[in-house]
């Protein structure tokens, strides 16, 4: 009864979301319009806290106006692309707002990129200028001869700390700005919902990074719904945002959401678990935009005084795994965890509107879960050649129907966009976006009949062993439950003479010499079915992740258990044993000669 009464209270937040209409194509709905509206209402309230700086909405708007005028007077037009290569700081937000005010497109580059990937992202965007933070000038300088921007006037350098000097190939942007420009630009009145606000690049884990197209309508709609039904914040709140603004989580779920209601943002260059709670208290951050790995880092820290009675009430993000969820919510006394699911280039948003546990929530889009053969990496079809839907709670490939209410903007690369579309799925002529993710339905109790879902794994990350499907995420959750394991990365590796892939896990240890392999082996045996137990364990020094803390698997998968190639210690389960032991050259030779008995 208590849950039923609570759910009735959720209706007042759910109904506006269900009734929400996306902005019309020619409507003046954009990031810059939202920002100017919040500036008009809350101009003297804080916009951004950063290190020793505090910017009000009014101050940031003046700087953005001046920057926009500078760009316009130097040839940047509506629809032009401009690279933004800078770490999280106020000038990142100001730069993006300035571009949006004149209808230009921000090309948001991952700040960890160097060399060929950096060259690819810049050249594929056909940008006319590059805004570069002083802190990222060195990797840009190293590729200057290989990119398609060459004039000194086209490199706008934004100073950072005193340790960086202005390079001879760029101009000092701030020296050309008027920080008292109160007049909004006329060009902003021509910026509409259909105009592209920015390009956000994929992580490149399945090839070279691809630029996902984000129109203003998507930014505005996401920010509106997330603040209205997710965070439930207003202009008096402050959001903790340490996620990179070049990524959709930090940008759309973080900065854009705060702008939508005139809230403040505490932004950081990088996440720090050791200073998190002290900063949350200092800036009274009532909201937190997260990804799951950050939450895992926080619960792995010893309890502190700073975490007690912390100000965080609601958090919105993605990737919080079930094995972390309950512990995090209870230990830090968080009222609302609103898990989100949706790709930058995708056409659907799942949201845990009802604040249920361990779910990505529901969606208003038309979706289906398809039967999928993990071993053959293919969608199963019926005798008529159409796809087959999952009819129970088993994982299936999530697809989203493409239509007027679920537009697929895709990538700038049309060929790459087409590869993400499935056609003639259930009938001739239909079209669906292929998420590439395995999802399952879950029972969350009373939810007004709304189906709820849970993320399982990426297609390609799930592997097959002993005629069973093995989810890397689910195995990783179990391994992470062992007290001494630091964030296990699970993947499948080929074993000579065996069908499918054997499980392998990589993780670091605080105390390698003191690690109890017998106890750990018993834990694995008691908590995982035999087919899901990792055959190989690689002990690494530090986990390699993307800029948004996604675990990198490709290199680990390629290295496999080849101890002649890697310096790390590798342990294994032999077919006749349940105890992990050190893999040596003799046993490796037996594996490679198909004599090990796997």
Regions found by a protein language model. Give the residues of each.
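Conserved AMP-binding/adenylation subdomain of ANL enzymes
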Residues: 220-238, 246-286, 301
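Conserved adenylate-forming
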Residues: 115-116, 144-166, 260-264, 268-408, ...
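Conserved AMP-binding/adenylate-forming core of the ANL superfamily
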Residues: 23-28, 44-89, 93-97, 114-119, ...
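Structural core segment of the AMP-binding/adenylate-forming
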Residues: 1, 6, 73-74, 97, ...
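AMP-binding/adenylate-forming catalytic core of the ANL superfamily
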Residues: 113-116, 120, 130-132, 342, ...
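AMP-binding/adenylate-forming catalytic domain of the ANL superfamily
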Residues: 528-551, 567-595
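Conserved pre-ATP/AMP-binding loop-to-beta segment of ANL
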Residues: 44, 157, 178-201, 208, ...
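Conserved AMP-binding A3 loop
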Residues: 56-58, 190, 197-221
């Amino acid at each position: 009864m208590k849950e039923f009464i609570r759910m009735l209270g959720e209706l007042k937040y759910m109904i506006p979301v269900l009734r929400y209409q996306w902005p019309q194509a020619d409507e003046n709905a954009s990031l810059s319009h939202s920002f100017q509206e919040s500036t008009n209402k809350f101009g003297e309230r804080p916009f951004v806290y950063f290190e020793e700086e505090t910017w009000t909405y009014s101050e940031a708007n003046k700087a953005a106006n001046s920057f926009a005028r500078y760009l316009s007077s130097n040839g940047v037009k509506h629809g032009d692309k401009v690279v933004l290569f800078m770490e999280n700081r106020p000038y990142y937000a100001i730069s993006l707002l300035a571009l949006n005010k004149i209808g230009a497109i921000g090309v948001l580059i991952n700040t960890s990129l160097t060399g060929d990937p950096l060259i690819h992202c810049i050249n594929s965007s056909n940008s006319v200028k590059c805004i570069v933070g002083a802190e990222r000038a060195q990797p840009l300088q190293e590729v200057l001869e290989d990119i398609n921007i060459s004039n000194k006037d086209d490199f706008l350098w934004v100073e950072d700390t005193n340790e960086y000097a202005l390079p001879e190939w760029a101009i000092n942007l701030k020296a050309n700005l008027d920080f008292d420009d109160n007049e909004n630009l006329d060009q902003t009145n021509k910026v509409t919902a259909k105009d592209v606000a920015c390009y956000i690049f994929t992580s490149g884990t399945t090839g070279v990074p691809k630029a996902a197209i984000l129109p203003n309508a998507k930014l505005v709609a996401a920010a509106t719904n997330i603040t209205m039904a997710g965070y439930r914040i207003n202009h008096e709140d402050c959001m903790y945002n340490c996620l990179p603004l070049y990524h959709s989580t930090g940008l759309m779920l973080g900065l854009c959401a705060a702008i939508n209601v005139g809230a403040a943002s505490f932004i950081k260059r990088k996440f720090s678990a050791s200073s998190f709670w002290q900063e949350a208290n200092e800036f009274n951050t009532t909201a937190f935009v997260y990804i799951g790995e950050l939450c895992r880092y926080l619960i792995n820290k010893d309890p502190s005084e700073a975490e007690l009675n912390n100000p965080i009430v609601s958090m919105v993000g993605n990737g919080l795994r079930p094995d972390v969820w309950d512990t995090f919510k209870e230990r830090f006394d968080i009222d609302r965890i609103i898990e989100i699911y949706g790709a930058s280039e995708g056409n659907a948003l799942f949201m845990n509107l009802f604040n249920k546990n361990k779910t990505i929530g529901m969606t208003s889009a038309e979706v289906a879960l398809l039967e999928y053969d993990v071993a053959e990496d293919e969608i199963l079809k019926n005798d008529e050649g159409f796809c087959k839907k999952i009819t129970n709670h088993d994982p299936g490939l999530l697809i989203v129907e493409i239509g007027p209410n679920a537009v697929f903007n895709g990538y700038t690369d049309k060929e790459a966009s087409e590869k993400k579309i499935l056609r003639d799925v259930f009938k001739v002529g239909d079209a669906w976006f292929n998420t590439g993710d395995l999802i399952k339905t879950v029972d969350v109790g009373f939810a007004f009949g709304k189906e709820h879902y849970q993320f399982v794994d990426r297609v390609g990350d799930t592997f097959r062993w002993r005629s069973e499907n093995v989810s890397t995420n689910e195995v990783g959750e179990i391994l992470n439950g062992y007290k001494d394991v630091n964030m296990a990365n699970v993947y499948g590796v080929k074993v000579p003479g065996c069908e499918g892939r054997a499980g392998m896990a990589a993780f670091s240890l605080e105390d390698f010499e003191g690690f109890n392999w017998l106890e750990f082996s018993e834990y694995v045996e008691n908590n995982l079915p035999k087919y899901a137990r990792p055959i190989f364990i690689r002990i690494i020094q530090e986990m390699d992740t993307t800029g948004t803390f996604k675990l990198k698997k490709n290199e680990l998968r390629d290295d496999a258990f080849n101890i002649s190639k890697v310096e790390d210690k590798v342990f294994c389960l032999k077919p006749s044993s349940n105890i992990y032991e050190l893999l040596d050259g003799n046993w490796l030779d037996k594996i490679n000669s198909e004599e090990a008995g796997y």
